[in-house]
């Protein structure tokens, strides 16, 4: 089914839950509850079975995949006391990254990207996070994400994640998402290297199309990174009560990573813009080379055509026409002229 546009919400009152993304069959709820000593994980499609974790005394990660199920989003929102406008933003997948602070929770919108090597396109997916006292709610559009490293650390008690509260889980999820941006930038860097080689050695129409697509990808990435910097800046500067002081340096570290990513994106944009200029210059040079060859050929044939034109005149008294060696002599003269001109052009380095 086609993706709904924002116009689908026209005329509806604020807080009306309308999903604006692509409808998919995927739907599941993943729950990970843990402490230093214990760990519990399960998947379900029954929303009622996960609601009791709201009052858990240990950190819980509830990942809801398939937000086209607006009834599930509404039920979770009602039970956890989430504002209707926040639920509306969760279902409106065209949000820019942002953070909003409420009395009992923190709401964050992020973007997750996947790179299609065949189409050379970025596909974005909105990921919404809600931090409560002991719980992190995550809302995704489809199955498949970049958070498996976090899952592994929780399952096998690696690092300090199971010694920390839910705010550290929130940091870990954001950090995993930002780390994936570095992987994405490596793929884009490889694509730039390939395009540079093609532009310099064998520029084709497909090359410039891929270059334009790469430029669009970088613009899309830039539109995500810049507001993400504001999100992380708010998390470590305007520290909400739900985030402990010990966790603040971790958010500052992720913020530093976003600055590095933003700088890399700007560098890549400059390189790609330069590639387009190089492509146009290469095409222009090839055209000039062709025109030069054609001009030289035309110049060589000008005196030959002149000689042929003289002897093509229909005058009755032209002595050379009746001369036995006239024809081979004229051909020889024309050949000598052509050779002299070719030698002259090579001496001038025009050939």
From Swiss-Prot:
Q: Which GO terms describe its cellular component?
A: plasma membrane
Q: What is the effect of changing residue 288 to L?
A: Abolishes Co(2+) uptake
Q: How does it sit in the membrane?
A: Multi-pass membrane protein
Instruction: Provide a GO biological process annotation.
Output: protein homooligomerization
How is the activity of this protein regulated?
A: Inhibited by cobalt hexaammine.
Annotated site residues (Threonine that confers selectivity for Co(2+) transport) in this chain:
295
Q: Cite the position(s) of the site with description Important for closing the ion permeation pathway in the closed state.
A: 294
The coiled-coil regions, if any, are 178-225
Regions that span the bilayer: 293-313, 325-345
Side Cytoplasmic, residues: 1-292, 346-351
Its annotated compartments are: Cell inner membrane
What is the residue range of the motif Probable selectivity filter? Answer: 312-314
Result when mutating residue 299 to L: Reduces Co(2+) uptake. Abolishes Co(2+) uptake
Query: What results from changing residue 299 to S?
Result: Abolishes Co(2+) uptake
State which ranges are Extracellular (membrane side).
314-324
Pfam families, per this entry? CorA
Q: What is the effect of changing residue 315 to W?
A: No effect on pentamerization. Increases ion transport
Q: Which SUPFAM superfamilies match?
A: CorA soluble domain-like, Magnesium transport protein CorA, transmembrane region
- Impact reported for residue 327 to F: No effect on pentamerization. Increases ion transport
Q: Which residues are listed under the site Essential for ion permeation?
A: 288
Swiss-Prot/TrEMBL keywords: Cell inner membrane, Cell membrane, Cobalt, Coiled coil, Ion transport, Magnesium, Membrane, Metal-binding, Transmembrane, Transmembrane helix, Transport
Q: Which family does it belong to?
A: Belongs to the CorA metal ion transporter (MIT) (TC 1.A.35) family.
Q: What does this protein do?
A: Mediates influx of magnesium ions. Mediates Co(2+) uptake. Has high selectivity for Co(2+). Alternates between open and closed states. Activated by low cytoplasmic Mg(2+) levels. Inactive when cytoplasmic Mg(2+) levels are high.
Domain-level remarks: The central ion permeation pathway is formed by the first transmembrane domain from each of the five subunits. Mg(2+) binding strengthens interactions between subunits and leads to the formation of a symmetrical homopentamer surrounding a closed ion permeation pathway. Co(2+) binding also induces a conformation change. Low Mg(2+) concentrations trigger both a conformation change within each subunit and a loosening of the interactions between subunits. This results in an open ion conduction pathway. In addition, this results in a less symmetrical shape of the whole complex.
Task: From the Swiss-Prot or TrEMBL record, give the protein name.
Answer: Cobalt/magnesium transport protein CorA
Q: Recite the lineage of the species.
A: Bacteria, Thermotogati, Thermotogota, Thermotogae, Thermotogales
Name the gene behind this protein. corA
């Amino acid at each position: 089914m086609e993706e709904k546009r924002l116009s689908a919400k026209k005329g509806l009152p604020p807080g009306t839950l309308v999903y604006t993304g692509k409808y998919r069959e995927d739907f599941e709820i993943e729950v990970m509850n843990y402490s230093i000593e214990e760990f519990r994980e399960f998947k379900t499609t029954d929303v009622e079975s996960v609601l009791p974790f709201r009052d858990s005394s240990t950190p819980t990660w509830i990942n809801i995949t398939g937000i086209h199920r607006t009834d599930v989003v509404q039920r979770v929102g009602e039970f956890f006391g989430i504002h209707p406008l926040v639920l509306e933003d969760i279902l409106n997948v065209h949000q820019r990254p942002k953070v909003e602070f409420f009395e009992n929770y923190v709401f964050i919108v992020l973007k997750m990207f996947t790179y299609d090597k065949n189409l050379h396109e970025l596909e974005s997916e909105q990921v919404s996070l809600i931090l409560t006292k002991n719980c992190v709610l995550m809302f995704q559009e489809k199955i498949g994400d970049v958070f498996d490293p976090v899952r592994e650390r929780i399952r096998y008690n690696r690092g300090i994640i199971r010694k920390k509260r839910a705010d550290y889980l929130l940091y870990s999820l954001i950090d995993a998402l930002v780390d994936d941006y570095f992987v994405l930038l490596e793929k884009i860097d490889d694509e730039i290297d390939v395009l540079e080689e093609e532009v310099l050695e064998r520029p084709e129409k497909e090359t410039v199309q891929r270059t334009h697509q790469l430029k669009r990808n970088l613009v899309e990435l830039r539109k995500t990174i810049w507001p993400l910097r504001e999100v992380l800046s708010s998390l470590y500067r305007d520290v909400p009560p739900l985030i402990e002081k010990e966790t603040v340096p971790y958010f500052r570290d992720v913020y530093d990573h976003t600055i590095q990513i933003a700088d890399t994106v700007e560098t890549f944009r400059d390189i790609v813009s330069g590639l387009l200029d190089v492509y146009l210059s290469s095409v222009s040079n090839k055209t000039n080379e062709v025109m030069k060859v054609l001009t030289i050929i035309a110049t060589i044939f000008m005196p030959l055509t002149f000689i042929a034109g003289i002897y093509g005149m229909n005058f009755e008294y032209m002595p050379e026409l009746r001369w036995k060696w006239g024809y081979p002599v004229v051909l020889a003269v024309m050949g000598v002229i052509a050779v002299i001109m070719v030698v002259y052009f090579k001496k001038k380095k025009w050939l």
